[in-house]
């Protein structure tokens, strides 16, 4: 029997855990789920799934739970991955995450090789499946084509007939904080052999309209650093390389207002905000407690009539 340790028991993890549980008999799997709160899996037991209460910051306990597994899957927030990767590289455990590869973790590459173990990051939807589909196309074209431009767009969107409609036409299906902070690091891509850099304030203003057959027109905005994939995709001589995020029409302009209001800023806080109404919180954070009606303040700030 192959043992898999999954770190984290949040929304995305639960989908993966159920999927592996359904395949556990076929592939002879035993899945350990370790997190601070695993109560869901005690009250909703799954086949071949063992929940373990674990404080990820307890490195000794974490290491003990890794010792008898073939694979570690970290579904934790990305800032926690380095400590997980460090332990795995020391004891020779295979590790998979869905998060972007950082320069810090990349330095552990040789340590994993020495222990005959692998580290696979960017194994989610975006980044992940988009890489696979990109390389599938590039490899299929092969050397018979001289690629001048390569653009890819990915977005976790509601199906057109979804009953979960809301004004944003969007639903959180993964870490909500990552959605809120999307674009905050800016973006860089290659356009006509020139590097284009966008700041946080610019990203949602510069969108591309993408038409998808039978689905309609969507918005695409620049996603982080596309330049670093020139070598990875073996597209060193290409003129344009752009990786984008896909959203429904109207999302970007509306989200840009939240950015300009400072509501996506996680670096500053408002004193006693838990006791405030949303109205008072907005006035306190954005408008320094001005007495005017909040709708009038926002309309005036952005010249909305």
Q: What name fits each language-model region?
A:
Residues 12:
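Hydrophobic/small residue at the entry helix of a nucleotide-binding pocket
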Residues 29-43:
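NAD(P)-binding Rossmann-fold cofactor-contacting core
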Residues 46-58:
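Rossmann-fold cofactor-recognition segment
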Residues 56-68:
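Conserved Rossmann-fold cofactor-binding substructure of NAD(P)-dependent oxidoreductases
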Residues 77, 87-105:
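ADP-ribose/adenylate-binding Rossmann-like module
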Residues 99-121:
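Rossmann-fold NAD(P)-binding glycine/threonine-rich loop
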Residues 140-305:
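C-terminal catalytic/substrate-binding lobe primarily of soluble NAD(P)-dependent oxidoreductases
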